[in-house]
Amino acid sequence: SLVLHQDADPRTGGVAVCGFTTAGMVGVIATSHIIKMLALRQLGTVMHKDFPAVALIHDEVPKHPVRVYQGDGIGVFTSEIQFGNETDIPFATTVLEWFTKGGFDRLIIIDGITRPEKELTSGDLYGVGSISAARERLKRLDIEPIQQGVVSGITGFLLSEGDRLGIDITALLSEASPMYPDARAAALAVEAVSDLTGMEIPLTELLENARSIEDSVRDIIENASQMLPAPEPENTTDIDPSFG
């Protein structure tokens, strides 16, 4: 459940962005960069009885692994630990709770995808919109839509709920390496967030320090994952080979 800091006001408004620890760690790298570049303040954490007792240390400060941040017209939900897929629906429900309490207009999900049959080179970015307005935005930015396919995990559930409830949700799916953190794929998604929101989010630091960022994220995930059961293989967001 969402636990806010004392005296925190969850009403942020504007755009909500969320990212999770999935393929290529794209979501968590992208959201961490957005938080840093926009100097967002932490609003609270997400707690669950099955979460490990662990603190992730950032610049000497201990943090819970699942956190929410807010700034002027933007909120960010980020998870730095990969959980088993049995937590996908509770996680997604918590995201929707945060979205509602924050009074946001729309939600952007940043996620990584893999296509095992394709050799990854430059990488591609795909988009899915839950309502027609979201799909029109993607079209205006020439972000390739997924015509047919399957999006699994938290992202897939949120998109389906967006369609069911009429919530404006956009998923930015950046093709990433299935083997290691992919900061370059994250940069592609962050650039799209800038375009979708009109917010200036500098990319120079992310691109110039891609290797060190990837190494740092890998260390955090590996250390934290030792405290969790191994995730199910299907927890990675995949796309059905029929899409394109």
Summary of predicted features, one role per range:
Residues 1-81:
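N-terminal short beta-loop-beta anion/metal-coordinating cradle
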Residues 116-196:
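Catalytic cores of processing enzymes, dominated by hydrolases/peptidases
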Residues 18-19, 77-78, 109-111, 173-175:
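Short beta-strand segments
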Residues 25-29, 86-90, 94, 149, ...:
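Conserved active-site and cofactor/substrate-binding residues in soluble primary-metabolism enzymes
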